[in-house]
C-alpha cells in the first residue's frame, strides 16, 4: 500500500493550548475522527492519527468556534506536525501518503 512506502503510517499534529481556536479544533477533530489519539501535555495537545490522515476543515472549526477563521489565522495555533502537508484555502490535510499529495 502506498501509504506505507515511507515506513511511517501515523501522523501527528501539535496544537498549543489556551485559545478558543485550538479548543474548537480539538473538539471538531474528536467529533469527526474517533480513532485519533489525543495526548494532553499541559501546554499543548499532540493529536496522532494511527491511520495516517488528519484533516482540519476551517468551515467546521469556524462553526464550532462561532466566528470565521481562515487557514492563515489557524496556522498560528498549529505549532508543529509530523507527516506531509497539503493546504487548500479552507482545509489543512496531514497525511503519510506521498501519492495522496500528487493526486490533488
What positions do the PLM features span?
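Generic alpha-helical secondary structure signal
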Residues: 20-23, 72
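Helix-rich interaction surfaces within compact, conserved domain-sized segments
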Residues: 41-44, 50-104
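Intrinsically disordered, low-complexity boundary segments flanking structured domains
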Residues: 1-3, 33-34, 78-82
